[in-house]
């Protein structure tokens, strides 16, 4: 059997994972939240417990371009999910703060992501998951 290129496999799994998340309806003001919006809510919620979160943090965390993050954040601001407030340490920077509406969605989003992650890892041992995570981290470093 011929080996399928790893890049194709990674892209395929990523697409299927996003599609799965899109099939779990989570509406805010009549519009379904995208997987990226959901993950941003989780990351900002969790990281803001211990530190200010800035746009550049999301760029690094998700390995996406500034313009991509800007577009997603602007839409989330428009929809009342987050606001940008001046940083207490550096007034030039704007920290990301979730609104009460986004915080109310956090538990549901967290549950959805945990269920999707469980489905993704179904049939894998803890050792296989740890090994795969190590391999992915190495691949990420290779391509940076």
Where would I find each of the regions flagged by the language model?
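C-terminal regulatory/oligomerization modules of transcriptional regulators
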Residues: 1, 127-144
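N-terminal leader segment of winged-helix/HTH proteins
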Residues: 1-31, 79
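N-terminal positioning helix adjacent to the helix-turn-helix/winged-helix DNA-binding module
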Residues: 2, 6, 36-40, 54, ...
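N-terminal helix-turn-helix DNA-binding core of bacterial DNA-binding proteins
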Residues: 22-65
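Short, hydrophobic-biased segments on the C-terminal half of alpha helices
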Residues: 55, 73-74
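Charged, amphipathic alpha-helical coiled-coil/dimerization segments
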Residues: 74-133
């Amino acid at each position: 059997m011929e080996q399928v290129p790893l890049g194709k496999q990674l892209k395929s799994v990523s697409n299927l994972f996003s599609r799965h998340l899109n099939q779990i309806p989570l509406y805010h003001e009549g519009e379904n939240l995208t997987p990226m919006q959901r993950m941003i809510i989780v990351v900002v919620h969790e990281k803001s417990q211990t530190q200010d979160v800035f746009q550049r943090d999301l760029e690094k965390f998700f390995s996406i371009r500034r313009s991509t993050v800007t577009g997603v954040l602007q839409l989330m601001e428009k929809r009342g999910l987050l606001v940008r407030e001046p940083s207490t340490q550096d007034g030039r920077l704007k920290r990301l703060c979730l609104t009460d509406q986004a915080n109310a969605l956090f538990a549901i989003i967290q549950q959805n992501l945990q269920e999707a992650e469980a489905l993704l890892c179904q049939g894998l041992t803890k050792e296989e998951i740890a090994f795969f995570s190590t391999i992915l981290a190495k691949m990420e470093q290779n391509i940076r």
